[in-house]
Amino acid sequence: VVAEGLGIDTASLGELTLALRAGVDPSRIGLHGNNKSDAEIRLALEAGIHRIFIDSMDEVRQIERIAADLGVVAPVMVRLKSGIHAGGNEYIATAHEDQKFGLSLATGQAFEAVAAIKDAAHLDFRGLHSHIGSQIFGTEAFVEAARIVVDFAARVSGELGLDVPAIDLGGGVGIAYTGQDPIPTSPVEVARALAT
């Protein structure tokens, strides 16, 4: 990873510590997880990682508090629940309303979080993130999720006057593990569908 100059997402104190010890450039590290500890957030901020993905209003307050204690500004993205049902089965779908990851667009939580980040002295809004699941065949779910996130970005810009510097669209392209699985969609096909 380091030799190739790739970025890495981490989701625990152990993963973050390992990435840093392995020499991954902190500007290429993201911190995910819907139950981040103070220790994880503190290490992320002290190391100067690229961004922390916010999953709840509690995390908005938690990250603001820790950043204020350290005298730094935390780079954050808001993870959205787009309502998309995608993925090979319900256990790996990550964007519908009953999932523990992200803030709901449907209930207004996501908008509330972005507004709170805008008003926070120690948070720097870096954009919006969505991850719709894994083992996704076809392009439709990716395109629909992108439309939903872009529409929300326009609302954030229009109603809050806040630029949305980045949109991070996640989801795992399906893999044919068995002969019965459909032919996988290539990342190129997904990119083409998103470009139209």
Labelled PLM ranges:
Residues 46-51, 90-105, 138-143, 178-188:
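Glycine-rich tight-turn/loop motif centered on a GG-T
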Residues 7-8, 26-30, 51, 73-79, ...:
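Structural preference for beta-strand elements that scaffold enzyme active sites
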Residues 1, 12, 44, 63, ...:
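Conserved, mostly hydrophobic/aromatic
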Residues 1-3, 19-26, 45-46, 67-71, ...:
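Acidic (Asp/Glu)-rich catalytic clusters
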Residues 1-49, 88:
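N-terminal active-site wall of soluble small-molecule enzyme domains
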Residues 134-196:
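C-terminal active-site-proximal or functional interface alpha/beta core segments in diverse enzymes
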Residues 19, 82, 106-125, 149-164, ...:
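Structured alpha-helical segments in the cores of large, soluble enzyme domains
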Residues 56-124:
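Conserved anion-binding
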